Amino acid sequence: MSSEAVSYFSHPFPRRQSVGVSVGGVIVGGSAPVVVQSMTNTDTADVDSTVAQVAALHRAGSEIVRITVDRDESAAAVPKIRERLERLGHDVPLVGDFHYIGHKLLADHPACAEALAKYRINPGNVGFKDKKDKQFADIVEMAIRYDKPVRIGVNWGSLDQELLTTLMDRNQDAGAPLSAQEVMREAIVQSALISANLAEEIGLGRDKIILSAKVSQVQDLIAVYTMLAQRSNHALHLGLTEAGMGTKGIVASSAAMGILLQQGIGDTIRISLTPEPGGDRTREVQVSQELLQTMGFRQFIPIVAACPGCGRTTSTVFQELAQTIQDDIRRNMPVWREKYPGVEALSVAVMGCIVNGPGESKHADIGISLPGTGETPSAPVFVDGKKVTTLRGPAIAEDFQKMVADYIENRFGLDQKIAAGQN
């Protein structure tokens, strides 16, 4: 599976040059586009539930999916999950999330070690005191044996306390001590880099190592990843841990990662959202895609532009139509992506009145300007910048939906036929 299958825009700033890492065929870093990944919240030992959620995340556009491997039952389930997913046509790479006993689980379950595409190691809890380096080395040696990459994932909530204490003591002895926050940031960065250096000394290539350093505050995340980017060329996994629920989590993650991505920092992202009760786990994938697409780094799905509404648009018709078109696009994208290559570049405008409606509609591939309050009950439609018709009557929404479907068929279906004919 290749992440190159989705369109990639040129980056407005030079991308930080990192070493590319292949994760089950998906390239993270190097010149590859920023990869979207996610994580399940099922009990991995529950094969049916985990397969269903991984499949849903993959269909939504997650290019890598992480699963918890926390005990023998979970490790034993991994090859079954991998096999079931492949039978269903989901070749998405699976990452094993290990804490505390990862070295033991990988040794005791070789089929699990083989089935996973990457191992996540947390330096803060891989082992303690004299066992730490040995157990870290055990996992790295497993990665070498099975030719797997690792993510060395530092998290401020489980930071190596010995390292933090050492840096705090040194700072206390210094003439111009840093703040506790600055020492914490330095400890996070050092934990990642020391662990990466140790992995390389053991024999793991730099093209097998991805680093992450997750914190829960936006300014800390920006500072920590900026430091990491300056001190190494390892591929970087961005994520704001414990971002929270709903709007708060989306805004915090987007603010932090948007700034880093704009500076060319970051090779793969996960937006960690706390699901609302009964919420859809795939929401985090959608938000990740929308962040990258809004910033112009990648294209995943056609853009539907719609005005926010004002006193001129007291009717909800344009809002309902915009939502219907967006939902229809999302529902059909898994099929359209295969059937109509390039369709993710489509732009659609659904506008609510005469002020900006015609202009915005002309700039879209296909757009409609619905009548505002007091305007003539008609809706001009523009295709490729030219007015092609005016819709009237109670079926304006249905008529425009059909025009969008016909446009996709005629434009992107024709492109595919021409390409097939040339071959």
From Swiss-Prot:
One of its GO terms (molecular function) is iron ion binding. Signal peptide: none annotated. Its EC number is 1.17.7.3. [4Fe-4S] cluster binds at residues 307, 310, 353, 360. It holds the Pfam family GcpE. It catalyses: (2E)-4-hydroxy-3-methylbut-2-enyl diphosphate + oxidized [flavodoxin] + H2O + 2 H(+) = 2-C-methyl-D-erythritol 2,4-cyclic diphosphate + reduced [flavodoxin]. Its cofactor is [4Fe-4S] cluster. InterPro entries: Dihydropteroate_synth-like_sf, IspG_bac, IspG_bac-typ, NO2/SO3_Rdtase_4Fe4S_sf. Binds 1 [4Fe-4S] cluster. Keywords: 4Fe-4S, Iron, Iron-sulfur, Isoprene biosynthesis, Metal-binding, Oxidoreductase. GO terms for biological process: isopentenyl diphosphate biosynthetic process, methylerythritol 4-phosphate pathway; terpenoid biosynthetic process. It is an enzyme of class 1 (oxidoreductase). The keyword Metal-binding applies. Pathway: Isoprenoid biosynthesis; isopentenyl diphosphate biosynthesis via DXP pathway; isopentenyl diphosphate from 1-deoxy-D-xylulose 5-phosphate: step 5/6. Belongs to the IspG family. Converts 2C-methyl-D-erythritol 2,4-cyclodiphosphate (ME-2,4cPP) into 1-hydroxy-2-methyl-2-(E)-butenyl 4-diphosphate. This is 4-hydroxy-3-methylbut-2-en-1-yl diphosphate synthase (flavodoxin). The lineage of its organism: Bacteria, Pseudomonadati, Pseudomonadota, Alphaproteobacteria, Hyphomicrobiales.
